[in-house]
């Protein structure tokens, strides 16, 4: 089966919107053992859409079309598909009724423009979208099935999981057994990870993939076939051992998710006092439902005055050592923990750049501390001088990893290949 994707929309084509839908779809398909062979992005021009539908349908078996199903004049996917096949649009009475019911339930009057979303090509098969007003559909043109989905990410994801994947599995008899193991890493470059993994002799049916999503690099271990799937846990365990401290989570999208899972199941509590990370530590945890059970408070103490008045940092500590220092960040962590007697508190203070660095403390210098009931762990690291956002996100990741290691009763301070550390 040859799978392709067509993404529509001027805002996507011009770069005004980053096409996260395409990245998610490709990754999701890969996790099911299905590889996308081609992706095309087209603007909101009827003739261009018609041309690409006709041309790509000669080469692909299945094409997922994303976007262009809304009620406005620049939503042209249904019209373009009808013209590409030489047929008219007709109203789908079932979807019109769904639209009317949706607006009634939400105590809103349905705009006339929304009726456009019930207009489908004559030969179209309706594809259910239970979470939105855009009607999905599929049409056979030349050798390909074109499967139309809305551009709203939540709606796309629902339709792909509930409609698209079952359809292609049935249509093309895709019964191959596939399993996937993910290892999340921090502090090591992709090439450094590959240098350790590539010499390993992998069993037949097992392959390795890498995905960089800073501050993480995700290692995907694919197993295809029953024999390979049976060997997957052993292979993943061996790779994890080879990579050592680089691996910080298994089958989690982010290190924040790993911390959320462990705190949620531990009954322990966390507070944070953030300077250079500016709320990243707490914000990423709040993304997960249930975080209120362990996250007591998060303070952004950016100024020296706030460090003194809110956290109780000694002014003499700031005068003698500066805001970006181990003594200061240790007092920040202790102060944050003491406010509500949390089990743990994380604190960060650093120079994210692009300016503000000195010879002794260049941009990328970050002090991080973890306060516990029995003491304080701290380190001052030197991060690669890249973007301000990367310095901040890497700082949050290292802070999370310190907490993760404490929760696992492991050494809290460890070496990372691409992160330096100042001596105390």
Swiss-Prot record:
Optimum pH is 5.5-9.0. Keywords: Hydrolase, Pyridine nucleotide biosynthesis. Homodimer. It catalyses: beta-nicotinamide D-ribonucleotide + H2O = nicotinate beta-D-ribonucleotide + NH4(+). Gene3D superfamilies: 3.30.70.2860, CinA-like, MoaB/Mog-like domain. One of the key enzymes of the pyridine nucleotide cycle which permits cells to recycle the by products of NAD consumption back to NAD. Has no activity on NAD, NADP, nicotinamide or nicotinamide riboside. It is an enzyme of class 3 (hydrolase). InterPro entries: CinA (IPR050101), CinA-like_C (IPR036653), CinA_C (IPR008136), Competence-induced_CinA (IPR008135), MoaB/Mog-like_dom_sf (IPR036425), MoaB/Mog_dom (IPR001453). The lineage of its organism: Bacteria, Pseudomonadati, Pseudomonadota, Gammaproteobacteria, Alteromonadales. Pfam families: CinA, MoCF_biosynth. GO terms for biological process: pyridine nucleotide biosynthetic process. This is Nicotinamide-nucleotide amidohydrolase PncC. Its EC number is 3.5.1.42.
């Amino acid at each position: 089966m040859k799978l392709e994707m067509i993404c529509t929309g001027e805002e996507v084509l011009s770069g005004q919107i980053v096409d996260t839908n395409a990245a998610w779809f490709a990754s999701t398909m890969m996790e099911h053992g299905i590889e996308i062979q081609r992706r095309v992005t087209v603007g909101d021009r009827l003739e261009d859409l018609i041309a690409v539908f006709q041309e790509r349908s000669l080469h692909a078996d299945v094409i997922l079309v994303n976007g262009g199903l809304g009620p406005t004049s620049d939503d042209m996917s249904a019209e373009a598909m009808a013209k590409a096949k030489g047929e008219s649009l007709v109203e789908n009475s079932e979807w019109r009724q769904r639209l009317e019911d949706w607006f009634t339930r939400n105590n809103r009057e349905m705009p006339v423009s929304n009726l456009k979303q019930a207009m489908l090509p004559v030969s179209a098969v309706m594809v259910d979208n239970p979470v939105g007003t855009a009607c999905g559909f599929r049409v056979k043109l030349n050798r390909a099935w074109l499967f139309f989905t809305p551009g709203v990410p939540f709606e796309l994801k629902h339709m792909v999981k509930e409609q698209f994947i079952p359809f292609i599995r049935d249509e093309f008899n895709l019964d191959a057994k596939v399993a996937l193991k993910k290892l999340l890493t921090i502090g090591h470059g992709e090439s450094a990870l590959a240098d350790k993994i590539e010499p390993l002799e992998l069993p037949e049916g097992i392959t390795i993939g890498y995905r960089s999503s800073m501050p993480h690099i995700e290692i995907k271990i694919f197993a295809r076939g029953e024999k390979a799937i049976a060997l997957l846990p052993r292979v993943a365990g061996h790779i994890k051992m080879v990579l050592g401290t680089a691996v910080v989570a298994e089958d989690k999208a982010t290190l924040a998710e790993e911390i959320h899972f462990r705190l949620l199941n531990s009954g322990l509590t966390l507070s944070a006092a953030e300077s250079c990370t500016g709320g990243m530590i707490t914000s990423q945890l709040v993304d997960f439902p249930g975080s209120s059970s362990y996250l007591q408070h998060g303070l952004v103490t950016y100024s020296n005055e706030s460090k003194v008045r809110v956290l109780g940092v000694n002014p003499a500590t700031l005068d003698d050592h500066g805001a970006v220092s181990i003594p200061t960040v240790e007092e920040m962590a202790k102060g944050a923990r003491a406010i509500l007697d949390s089990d743990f508190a994380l604190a960060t203070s650093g120079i994210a750049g692009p300016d503000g660095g000195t010879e002794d403390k260049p941009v990328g210098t970050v002090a991080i501390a973890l306060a516990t009931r029995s003491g304080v762990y701290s380190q001052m690291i030197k991060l690669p001088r890249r973007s301000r956002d990367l310095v901040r996100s890497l700082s949050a990741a290292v802070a999370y990893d310190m907490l993760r290691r404490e929760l696992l009763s492991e050494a809290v301070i460890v070496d990372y290949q691409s992160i330096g550390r100042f001596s105390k």
